[in-house]
Regions:
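NTP/phosphate- and nucleic-acid-binding module
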Residues: 1-482
């Protein structure tokens, strides 16, 4: 029992070593395990269920916007990558290749999918003949492989799970509308479902997706001040259409190239969620994706235990039938206090306590994981009270994350200011940029910060470049990033 208690309580404090805290939490909360293959993790049931809830809600949103799911091969011929020069140059260092199969050397190497623009471009060239075939709105749920040198579970792994949308349109206007529509789907999902505030904006040319005309992103701030790119949406223009000869007969009877988009997000969202909301007690899971939303713990002496457990089971059935993801922990080999610590560490949003006196009074106690608030509620109003507390937990999580971001969002007019904000204060900084790639590269070299995006709604507009002092073309968010 002492060993179990140690397992629950010993988590490295965030202020002492944030990276160690993160690893402690995801391991102790049983979300993942390391595999024998470097950079690849095993999703354990609780970790994978979070991803399932993300998939379920995002699928709903994709289908509302007219998209359908499909699946494309994991293996991509090398010749496909050669057709789009920027694309292959962007991904080549990370590509694993299959060179043999069945004991024979392959005539052409096959890349293990890093993303599917090339394969899907090839298929679209076969499927699209006329304007009547457009738009094509397809999403794929898949695994992808990018051979990362430095890995971190959920946030940066050699193999990861994601969704990638790929669409084809008659013209630039429709394709750009799609690009921004899906960026907004991501923003609304991450803020409304994961309780993570994000900054939406356009990537600088050096940070664009390989082969894109324009890339847009949502950026989230972790509790160590670093950024995570939580989702991207790309306008690809006609680049892939030309490379893969995706032409259609227009309404005017002319052969035209389609305009394409792609957009994606991944299991990085799980890592982001943990880093944004977790604390020194462990995980703090947003209610809408938590595998268990309510943990029910019967308490009291042995002589009343049978009756308390029986009533707990009745309330469990009521909550479950109302669509609440609920569990009962009626173990007798650990104390209620130990259970309280365990489920706080696992991030369960709401705890329900029921004892013999509560039964007599027709009440039970609800406890919020975030605020620690205890609320005595009538059992005949339990469903309403639980749903209300779950919504309160979500709202409080969002407000806390937003407050943290506001407190760690700075403004820099000189390189010295930016260095100080990156090294000492740690967070995001707004700074002016002249548009020269060399200045952007120098900022990274001297401060370790990269441009996250050019925000659509900056808190202020900068007039001079932080690096060279020339007039600024853009106001940019800079931060160190995962």
């Amino acid at each position: 029992m002492a060993k179990d208690k140690q397992f629950v309580t010993e988590i490295t404090p965030q202020g002492e070593d944030f990276s160690r805290w993160y690893i402690d939490v995801i391991k102790k909360a049983d979300l993942m395990d390391y595999s024998p293959v470097r950079g690849c993790i095993v999703f354990k049931p609780d970790g994978f269920e979070i991803w399932e809830h993300i998939q379920e809600e995002m699928n709903r949103r994709f289908k509302e916007t007219g998209h359908r799911n499909a699946y494309f091969p994991l293996f991509i011929p090398e010749s496909f990558f050669q057709k789009e020069k920027e694309h292959v140059e962007g991904f080549n260092p990370e590509l694993p290749w299959v060179t043999e199969a069945g004991g024979d050397k392959l005539e052409e190497r096959l890349a293990i999918r890093p993303t599917s623009e090339t394969m899907i471009g090839h298929m679209y060239s076969k499927w699209i003949q006329s304007y009547r075939d457009l738009p094509v709105l397809i999403n794929q749920w898949a695994n992808v492989v990018r051979w990362e040198k430095r890995t971190l579970p959920f946030l940066r792994t050699s193999e990861f799970l994601w969704q990638e949308g790929h669409t084809a349109h008659e013209n630039e206007e429709e394709a750009r509308e799609e690009t921004m529509r899906m960026l907004e789907v991501y923003r609304d999902f991450v803020e409304g479902y994961l309780a993570i505030p994000v900054i939406t904006g356009q990537k600088t040319p050096s940070e664009r997706f390989a082969g894109a005309v324009d890339t847009f992103s949502i950026e989230a701030m972790m509790k160590d001040g670093r950024a995570v790119q939580a989702g991207t949406s790309h306008y690809l223009g006609t680049k892939f259409a030309v490379a893969f000869d995706i032409q259609y007969l227009s309404r005017e009877n002319n052969l035209e190239y389609v305009h394409t988009t792609s957009w994606g997000t991944s299991t990085r969202m799980i890592g982001s969620m943990i880093m944004v909301h977790g604390d020194d007690r462990g995980l703090a899971l947003p209610p809408k994706v938590a595998p268990t939303q309510v943990i029910m713990i019967p308490i009291g002496p042995p002589k009343t235990r049978e009756a308390v457990v029986a009533r707990t089971d009745e309330l469990f059935k009521e909550l479950k039938s109302a669509g609440v993801r609920v569990r009962v922990d009626d173990r007798t080999d650990v104390t209620p206090g130990w259970k309280f610590n365990e489920y706080e560490m696992r991030g369960v949003p709401v705890r329900l306590e029921l004892g013999p006196r509560d039964m007599e009074n027709g009440v039970c106690v609800l406890v919020s994981r975030i605020s620690g608030e205890k609320k005595v509620v009538q059992q005949d109003r339990l469903i309403e009270e639980v749903k209300e507390m779950l919504e309160q937990v979500h709202q409080e999580m969002y407000e806390r994350a937003l407050k943290f971001r506001e407190e760690h969002f700075y403004s820099a007019d000189t390189m010295d200011e930016l260095k100080n904000e990156m090294e000492e204060k740690r967070g995001f900084a707004l700074a002016g940029w002249c548009g020269d790639d060399a200045c952007e590269a120098k900022v990274k070299e001297e401060t370790g910060a990269t441009s996250r995006n050019i925000p659509f709604e900056p808190a202020e507009t900068k007039s001079t470049c932080i690096c060279c002092g020339k007039p600024a073309q853009h106001t940019v968010v800079f931060a160190k990033a995962y």
